[in-house]
Amino acid sequence: MAMKKLLIASLLFSSATVYGAEGFVVKDIHFEGLQRVAVGAALLSMPVRTGDTVNDEDISNTIRALFATGNFEDVRVLRDGNTLLVQVKERPTIASITFSGNKSVKDDMLKQNLEASGVRVGESLDRTTLSDIEKGLEDFYYSVGKYSASVKAVVTPLPRNRVDLKLVFQEGVSAKIQQINIVGNHAFSTEELISHFQLRDEVPWWNVVGDRKYQKQKLAGDLETLRSYYLDRGYARFNIDSTQVSLTPDKKGIYITVNITEGDQYKLSGVQVSGNLAGHSAEIEKLTKIEPGELYNGTKVTKMEDDIKKLLGRYGYAYPRVQSQPEINDADKTVKLRVNVDAGNRFYVRKIRFEGNDTSKDSVLRREMRQMEGAWLGSDLVDQGKERLNRLGFFETVDTDTQRVPGSPDQVDVVYKVKERNTGSFNFGIGYGTESGVSFQAGVQQDNWLGTGYSVGINGTKNDYQTYSELSVTNPYFTVDGVSLGGRIFYNDFEADDADLSDYTNKSYGTDVTLGFPINEYNTLRAGLGYVHNKLSNMQPQIAMDRYLESMGDPDASDFAADDFTFNYGWTYNKLDRGYFPTDGSRVNLTGKVTIPGSDNEYYKVSLDTATYVPIDNDHKWVVLGRTRWGYGDGLGGKEMPFYENFYAGGSSTVRGFQSNTIGPKAVYKNGARTSGGDNDEYEDCTQESGCKSDDAVGGNAMAVASLEFITPTPFISEKYANSVRTSFFWDMGTVWDTNWDPSSAPSDVPDYSDPGNIRMSAGIALQWMSPLGPLVFSYAQPFKKYDGDKAEQFQFNIGKTW
């Protein structure tokens, strides 16, 4: 042993010359210190083998090769005669990774970043990488204004050369902006310029965008906003000279100073376009026209470049280059814009592929495409396909990816990546709605039946006032041209009194069939035929009902039956960005019906629904929604429209904050009628000669409803569920009236129900959730304009209604 130590000491002492330039032949290789790494694996990583002649350079290469494996903290190579002695110290293996004190950064995100750097359980620990991670995390906190933050890696040794790794965070508090100064501005005040920033030194309570917490990225965005503000107003020489960010000694306050040079305003003198225009010079020229004397505007220049790219993209030039170079003339304060265009190659579509459609068949998606395989690539056609897939309502998200075909100079594949949502439900259960009380529901509803695109529904409902069942089927592509065919059969037993309406019972059944004819991308016409049988009973005579029965020649009937055949028609304009929870676009839906010969009744009825979504931010998280609903109907040939076909308002789908159906005309019962009491649970006879006023709604033949909503991000909801939950603040208004009402036929204390000016209003908040059980809608509204007989209902909850 003493001899060995002496040998090693002598080797170390003479390490510079032990191998010699002439080298020596390696007869054997021994390792010391290996634990986890196998000898064979270590030998394979070495450039030296038994029998090789090695010198100093070979030994250096061996040390580098062993270090390069990442398995060792220290490597020494010694000579013992003709034996190489390799002494190593293995890096410890990570047994566990934990985090402490991190609030701004989630554990999952930290684990992903660590794994990307090669730090994971079961791998060896590289302390150099660990130091880089500490610094990187601290830099992240500094970028979001937390200058007192610190991140420390605590390594705890364990048996068998293992360690526990714990990252300890001290995040501290975000530094708040104390003051923002802009130096060098003369044309605009500092207050005016800062009002366009996200970062503020003062934030009013009503400002939901401004923020006093400093973030490096937000400052960069604000500086770009400042630059654009000046460039859009003709200041072509504008420049941000410098930016100083000063930190208070306690690291809790920030002072920002921006030094600028405004320069003078410049006007455009002309636009000159050159380059490869691919034969579209006339169209490009239209996009580059300017008004004489127009101020230079950076945003308009960028938009012009984008418009040229979009134009060329429609003709298959998928990767055009458009560069604008302003030529500034300081003498006359003008700018001549030189635009260089290179259309590049025209690309053709080899294949259109779909990814993520595990349920929906390819054919269902492919029939929505406007881009054809083999044709040149049209960016507008690809976008139309995306819009049409979104409007189906089958998918949470739809993304497109244009991929160049390897080895081909002019071919691409277009890939549509979809994320399917649950388009169907099977339910059997008991529910509660504020409009319907306790309800029993059972049914199957599938908007994408077996992935074919068919909509199939078998539904039944039983609640306090209704027993309803329906079977419906719709084929959206009955023909290859997109003509749809839909039909349904239904049965309904309706107790009007229990629905806060006038007293009568209506048992009805019927069927209808409808064809839909697409006119273009956004417009569809519908036409169809329907049949319905209505059996009325338990009718308590009231003025509106009596007026109808009299027109039918049976004024004293307490029971009545009618069979009607109708011609149904409709028109839909749909330019919404997606089928559910839209954020942009408009939808207009006109529906109507008119009785045809062979019917007992003679009347027509038409309604118009509109909805417009206007996003106010680029991410479409803040959206303004305007909705209207109009309805009108009347009798034909001297007959009245049936009272059971009247329009109603009030409830979650019209004017929230009011009980369902309670807005508008109320029943005025005739002398001798059995009327309901105020709580709809006690009855008494009407004994007044002129009739008895009541709170029972009868609806009207005309309706107008409007709503203004402000859709906001839902607080406390992660991005994963953001597309399934919607929160909005709303203002509803509406009314129902009877154009055939005769005030002289009712007691003097009864309002004039022919007056359309009796508008009800409410305001509140709504939450919609696309739950696994179906759409759930919660709303709380406070009526602030109502009339005699209206019934308030602040909280409302329903299943299956969204807008």
Curated annotation (Swiss-Prot):
A GO CC annotation given for this chain: Bam protein complex
Key words, A-Z: Cell outer membrane, Membrane, Repeat, Signal, Transmembrane, Transmembrane beta strand
Gene3D superfamilies assigned: membrane protein fhac (3.10.20.310), membrane protein fhac: a member of the omp85/tpsb transporter family (2.40.160.50)
Signal peptide: 1-20
Single GO biological process annotation from the record: protein insertion into membrane
Parts forming coiled coils: none
Entry's localization field: Cell outer membrane
The keyword Protein transport is assigned to this record: no
Segments forming domain POTRA: 24-91, 92-172, 175-263, 266-344, 347-421
Family: Belongs to the BamA family.
Complexes and interactors: Part of the Bam complex, which is composed of the outer membrane protein BamA, and four lipoproteins BamB, BamC, BamD and BamE.
Protein task: Part of the outer membrane protein assembly complex, which is involved in assembly and insertion of beta-barrel proteins into the outer membrane. Constitutes, with BamD, the core component of the assembly machinery.
Identification of the protein by name: Outer membrane protein assembly factor BamA
